[in-house]
């Protein structure tokens, strides 16, 4: 009840007392009761109107607000229903019991927000990490690294898998394994996070930015054909927001031009293309386990391939280029791109419930689709939701909605409305071609 100390007063109390209470609680409102029974909510705005009218604030609240109706909800009301009632006008709602006694209150700030992604750490994460700490295996050597790699490849039917320190280092490692260097060109989509293009630049090669397909937001196979040159060495296809690229067409381009295909699956763990998990189509594929990804290790990544030579080279490069049979003897100029045993312990625990996490994301997306479909025609004609494809099972890393017309004002209004309702939203990635540092790689 301490939280209600500066919020509740009786209808017999003066308006001046209510004003003092509102100034003290900083919430812009207070709750009015009659013999402990909830009556109404009055705001600083209500009192301001009385001041303008030069009313006597020493009179009781009952004199002015006896007929004012206030919103109150039962203490057991689900949060989603409370969110629906909160707005710019109704910023605070008292929560009452069956006898209309005030027990608590809700505001947008004290309700749990609906985040873009909430990490599920309710499995064996704590137990496995504790095991690492108890046994002192906290660096890049330890049983959990191999256990995580094995669990990952078996679940998604990958032949070979190698943990890395991040999704970005996995991409850079892939380019190094394929011997991509200065003078080579690597094709990359225009709409993506910067990791792929940065990895290409760090490899010394030239990125070639290619436009996207308007329906999927993934790299457009027809546009790739226009950008292929004698110097093209590889394509990095990014399965954006959980939607798979047109892999059938990409594989045709790869075969015809004798180039490599790297799948960036950072946002598409669990996505399927023609019955197979993405990551099974490229020469090398990479994943990210950053904190907002479908499964997480805090920071971390994975490189997968079916090519034993690529795998062996990646493993050496990942550990400083050191000969695995002759310690401290370096065969290659390598990197420290290893994942720690601690991170892998979290990853293993995450993989134990990967199926549940993926299914839940798809269920939530289906719910969004169902509810959006019920909107009136005028609204639906202004937006584009993720496009269904019979060949693809979208894992919906992030559910996305695009406004058809270029209307930044409407976009910002929607984001602001979501924020008021306690729902976290964000804009799409910026096109690479719009950023000064990458502009020269786009025609």
Q: How would you name each of these model-derived features?
A:
Residues 1-7, 13-14, 57-70, 132:
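Bateman (tandem CBS) regulatory domains
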Residues 7-27, 33-34, 51, 71-91, ...:
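The conserved cystathionine-beta-synthase
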Residues 40-45, 103-109:
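Short hydrophobic beta-strand motif reused across regulatory alpha/beta modules
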Residues 108-136:
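N-terminal "arm"/small-domain region of PLP-dependent enzymes with the aminotransferase-like
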Residues 129, 152, 170, 186, ...:
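Generic structural signal for small/hydrophobic residues in well-ordered secondary structure
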Residues 143-185, 199-203, 209-211, 276:
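Phosphate-binding glycine-rich loop
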Residues 148-150, 159, 222, 226, ...:
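PLP-dependent aminotransferase class I/II
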Residues 215-297, 302-304, 308-309, 410:
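Active-site phosphate-binding strand-loop segment of PLP-dependent enzymes
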């Amino acid at each position: 009840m301490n939280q209600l100390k500066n919020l509740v007063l009786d209808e017999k109390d003066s308006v001046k007392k209510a004003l003092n209470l509102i100034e003290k609680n900083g919430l812009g409102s207070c709750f009015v009761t009659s013999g402990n029974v909830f009556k109404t909510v009055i705001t600083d705005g209500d009192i301001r109107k009385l001041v303008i009218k030069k009313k006597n604030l020493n009179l009781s609240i009952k004199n002015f607000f006896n007929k004012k109706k206030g919103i109150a909800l039962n203490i057991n009301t689900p949060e989603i229903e409370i969110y629906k009632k909160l707005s710019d006008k109704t910023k605070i709602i008292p929560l009452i019991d069956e006898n209309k006694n005030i027990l608590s209150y809700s505001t947008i700030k004290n309700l749990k927000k609906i985040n873009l992604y909430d990490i599920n750490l309710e499995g064996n994460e704590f137990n496995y990490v504790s095991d690492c700490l108890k046994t002192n295996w906290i660096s890049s050597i330890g049983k959990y690294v191999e256990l995580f790699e094995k669990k990952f490849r078996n679940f998604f039917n990958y032949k070979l898998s190698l943990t890395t320190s991040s999704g970005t280092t996995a991409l850079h490692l892939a380019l190094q394994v394929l011997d991509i260097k200065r003078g080579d060109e690597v094709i990359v989509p225009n709409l993506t996070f910067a990791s792929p293009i940065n990895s290409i630049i760090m490899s010394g090669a030239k990125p070639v930015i290619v436009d996207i397909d308007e329906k999927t937001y993934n790299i457009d196979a027809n546009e790739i054909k226009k950008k292929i040159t004698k110097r093209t060495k590889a394509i990095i296809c990014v399965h954006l927001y959980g939607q798979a690229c047109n892999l059938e067409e990409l594989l045709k381009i790869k075969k015809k031009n004798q180039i490599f295909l790297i799948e960036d699956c950072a946002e598409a763990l669990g996505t399927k293309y023609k019955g197979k998990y993405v990551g099974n189509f490229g020469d090398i594929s990479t994943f990210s386990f950053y904190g907002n990804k479908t499964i997480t290790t805090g920071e971390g990544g994975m490189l997968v391939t079916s090519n034993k030579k690529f795998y062996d080279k990646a493993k050496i490069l990942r550990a400083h280029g050191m000969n695995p049979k002759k310690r401290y003897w370096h065969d290659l100029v390598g990197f420290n791109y290893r994942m720690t045993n601690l991170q892998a312990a979290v990853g293993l625990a995450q993989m134990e419930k990967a199926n549940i996490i993926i299914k839940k994301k798809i269920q939530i997306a289906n719910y969004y689709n169902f509810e959006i479909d019920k909107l009136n025609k005028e609204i639906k004609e202004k937006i584009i939701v993720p496009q269904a494809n019979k060949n693809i099972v979208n894992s919906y890393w992030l559910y996305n909605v695009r406004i058809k017309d270029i209307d930044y004002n409407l976009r910002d209004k929607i984001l602001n409305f979501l924020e008021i309702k306690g729902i976290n939203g964000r804009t799409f990635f910026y096109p690479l071609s719009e950023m000064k540092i990458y502009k020269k790689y786009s025609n």
